[in-house]
């Protein structure tokens, strides 16, 4: 059997601005993100460090889009798995325009990394027992969340937790 090809993109980067969320006529959510990935290197001749940042357009569909709109904020680090897709349209002057986007839908993955701006803005500050959205992994529209964040809300503990910050539920 002949292979038809592979179209898979994996990115780890930082959100450039808060997600823009729209809803389609059928009620499905669509979130548009800009994601920055950077690489640094040292120039041999003078030892100077250089950096190049690449900006990616990411379009997230369904439940993933709703989660992105609730938890992702400018500066947040995120892991994205999706597919490349190029769209064509005609602008007002009749010129054909193209844009290439990373599409994240049912087969894609979005995982929020780190702590930076991972709490929704409308929630008040809570004790650091469970960082909202941190480490939340979502694969496709079928799983809303994985890990302890998927459980029902719990009452905050009477005493503050120790200062260490790790998750014993990590499967590796």
Curated annotation (Swiss-Prot):
Coiled coil: none
Domain SSB: 6-111
Span of the annotated motif Important for interaction with partner proteins: 167-172
Regions recorded as binding DNA: 55-61
The entry's keywords: DNA damage, DNA recombination, DNA repair, DNA replication, DNA-binding, Plasmid
UniProt record, GO biological process: DNA recombination; DNA repair; DNA replication
Ranges of biased composition (kind: Low complexity): 119-153
Superkingdom of origin: Bacteria
A molecular function (GO) term: single-stranded DNA binding
Cross-referenced SUPFAM superfamilies: Nucleic acid-binding proteins (SSF50249)
Presence of the UniProt keyword DNA repair in the record: yes
InterPro entries: NA-bd_OB-fold, Primosome_PriB/ssb, ssDNA-bd
Cellular component, GO annotation: nucleoid
Keyword NAD listed: no
Annotated segments matching region Disordered: 113-172
Family annotation (PANTHER family): SINGLE-STRANDED DNA-BINDING PROTEIN (PTHR10302:SF27)
Subunit structure of this chain's protein: Homotetramer.
Task of the protein: Plays an important role in DNA replication, recombination and repair. Binds to ssDNA and to an array of partner proteins to recruit them to their sites of action during DNA metabolism.
HAMAP family linked to this entry: SSB
This protein's name: Single-stranded DNA-binding protein 2
Organism: Salmonella typhimurium (strain LT2 / SGSC1412 / ATCC 700720)
